[in-house]
UniProtKB/Swiss-Prot annotation:
One Pfam family per UniProt: AstE_AspA_hybrid
Disulfide bonds: none
Protein name per UniProt: Succinylglutamate desuccinylase
Cofactor: Zn(2+)
Recorded catalytic activity of this chain's protein: N-succinyl-L-glutamate + H2O = L-glutamate + succinate
InterPro entries named among the record's database cross-references: AspA/AstE_fam, AstE_AspA_cat, Aste_AspA_hybrid_dom, SuccinylGlu_desuccinylase
Annotated EC: 3.5.1.96
Record's keyword annotation contains Metal-binding: yes
GO biological process, one term: arginine catabolic process to succinate
Length: 335
């Protein structure tokens, strides 16, 4: 196997390869771009016209997606996977991956779409670097652009594998992309309705990629992800990389759609979230339930039918989202 196929090993050891470009016997070109970043180019004349960005490790303790990218890259480097798509493999926060921690100083997935310019420190610099990697990768005209940012969650979930679909004013969510997600094993998709500061929101809003945050189970240490079944996703990603993906059609049977009703924003250290510490994502909440309180008699009371909570986290910094209240969506606004 080509040495550049061991991107995770290079990242974990903080090692820069002596040879920055390698070519497989079949003409697939691997190029090291910087820490945690590798570009794969298909052989000349065998390119299907897709640019695919696969990122993981934005949070360093979310290891199942990192291991998935490692398997895919090994397959490319040893010739078992035969790319016809141009692919970038990207490990988001190498320092946090090495420590096995969510982040070093601050959550890097709250620093995109210009937010890093208002901050400082290691993660702010890395967010700017990740944006530049993506900007250069997606700069080629007249090519399809797809970004999957792979994560696992800090808590359990009643729906284990789901996606978040970013928002851009004037741009509709794609039914075809939702069907592709369903074929890849996603059980639900949250259709977002406002701009965001995550990595996938940046590539969707600024670089015109079809982009998604994929939540794939619960965060566990390296080598302890037997309970996270990524077989369907891995199979689909190989098909996308090889350019032989079966047509998914536009049927969304079995895929649950949700939209954001409200975001719960923490404004002060007086913020209180009235939920059990171990509550799971997608837990249902009844109308009239007092969800959260903050200073100045600020209260969040559930008013929506069928409301559920995802990503509850009262420990975020002031001004950030401490949870999302979501409701079922009919999908009538899809393209």
């Amino acid at each position: 196997m080509l040495a550049l196929g061991k991107l995770l090993e290079l990242t974990l050891t903080d090692h820069e390869p002596a040879e920055k470009t390698q070519v497989t016997p079949k003409g697939v070109r691997l190029r090291w771009l910087g820490e945690g970043a590798l570009e794969v180019r298909p052989p000349e004349g065998d390119d299907c016209g897709l640019d695919l960005l696969l990122s993981a490790g934005i949070h360093g303790n979310e290891t199942a997606p990192i291991e998935l990218l490692e398997r895919l890259l090994h397959g490319v480097a040893n010739g078992k996977i035969k790319p016809r798509s141009r692919v970038m493999f990207l490990f988001g926060n190498p320092a946090a991956i090495r420590k096995g921690e969510r982040f070093i100083e601050q959550d890097i997935n709250r620093l995109f779409n210009g937010r890093h310019e208002l901050s400082s420190g290691f993660e702010a610099l890395r967010a700017a670097e990740l944006e530049q990697f993506a900007r250069v990768f997606f700069s080629k005209p007249e090519r399809a652009r797809l970004h999957y940012d792979l994560h696992t969650a800090i808590r359990g979930s009643k729906i284990e594998q789901f996606a978040l679909y970013p928002y851009k004013e004037g741009r509709k969510h794609s039914r075809r992309e939702l069907a592709r997600l369903a074929a890849a094993g996603m059980e639900a998709v949250l259709l977002q309705s406002k701009s965001s500061i995550t990595f996938s929101a940046f590539t969707y809003e600024q670089l015109d990629a079809e982009a998604f945050t994929l939540e794939l189970g619960k965060a566990r240490p390296f080598g302890q992800n037997e309970q996270v079944n990524l077989d369907k996703l891995e199979e689909r990603l190989i098909q996308i990389i090889e350019g032989n993906e079966p047509e998914a059609g536009d049927s969304l049977d079995g895929l649950k759609l949700f939209s954001v009703a409200r975001e719960i924003i923490k404004h002060s250290e007086g913020f209180r979230l009235h939920l059990p510490v171990d509550i799971e994502n997608f837990s249902e909440l009844s109308k009239g339930y007092l969800l959260a309180e903050d200073l100045a008699e600020m209260r969040w009371v559930v008013e929506e039918e069928g409301a559920r909570i995802i990503f509850p986290n009262p420990k975020v910094k002031n001004g950030l989202r401490a949870g999302i209240l979501i409701v079922p969506d009919s999908g009538q606004r899809l393209d």
